[in-house]
Amino acid sequence: LYRDCQSLVEAIQKILFYNGLLWQVGHRHVGLGRMDLVLYPYYKKDVEANRLNYEQAKGLLKEMCLLLGKDSPMKSLNLIGDSGQYIILGGVDKNGKNTDNELTRMFLELFEELRIPDPKLIFRVNEETPMDTWKRSIRCLANGCGSPLFMNETLIMENMVKFGYRNEDVWNVGTSACWEPLIIGKSSDQNNPFISILACNALKKALTEMEDELDYGGLLQLVKRNLAEETRSVVVDKDYDYSPIMSLFNESCIRSGKDFAHQGSDYMYQGAQLLGLPNLVNSLLNIKKYVYEQGLVSLGICREIVQTDYENHLDIKQLFKSANDKKFGLCDEYVLRLSQELIGTVSETIGKLTANGYNVKFGLSSPSYISRGKVASATLDGRNAGEPFAVHISPLSSTIDIAEVLDFASSLSYPVNCLNGNVVDYVIP
């Protein structure tokens, strides 16, 4: 611990030692950083000195990954494997050059073989990512382990600079927990310190407030107003404890002489998360079609459904769930516009707020889609009370294929402050 590592095995041991120490002092979601970039010099030195070959190095990484995942149930929060133990692969260095190397491929091979859910891989990709590495990543993902997640680093880094991160720092983008971007070694960003912004609360409140003669445009404006109020209610200043051990690993803290959680880092942006956007969009699409355009359902029935969980209205539940040909995830002009307007409402509201003196970012992904769903009432997209909300930027309909979902996600315009994780999840049977 008192000197630089002299070999790959020493580097791995040091990482495991400090990783264990961080968990023991109460830190959770301890990310592992850019392991292929960090470990490669030690691997290269060992190979050149004939101390190690490819398979032996792969064996060392295997033991490291198995050890990290051994206590996954204890480390996990909402779901088993939700430990935040992410290994980041690929991406560019500070000179803009791709860092893919033998360890990048080694990690991908290893996870393809082990099929473990924890730790996980994040693969930073760009236009120069080698095709061979892409193919290895797809093979790894296809085995069902959930790794790697793909990070569109070019777009993310551009938006980080626009938001306030320095251009010379964003090459070293990492993640806090699962997908929320930050700068490794210079950030103390808290990317999910607030309860999630529950999008469907805006419609539920609107239904209780509105008059039945209000037209759809008026309802939509009321929903937007309530969504802004919901957003303002969750963004608050937080009282953080001191963290001497974490401060030792933050170069900004060492330079400033201040604690990690008390203005020692170069960046301390707080992050909010929008939960259930697909549910709200589909609910509004159903109201537009079946209440205002076709007159099949009244607003009174909609209120009753939310209050009674579709009691005596199973036919309407099926109608709302399956019949509408316009759904979140489809590249339909109005679906995209409605989604964009709701995202814009949150963005505009967040843009006027601060937390602990710093600007706030938000994302369209939230890990609480199960826990918040358990205590939420029914929604007008066919979801029963207690059921999970939609996962991130993902369709609720199995008829929308992955290509269309990706087209939809790429067709959205993400505001500069919509930077706290925008994940497309898709389950392939």
Describe each region flagged by the PLM.
Residues 1-429:
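Conserved catalytic cores of very large enzyme subunits
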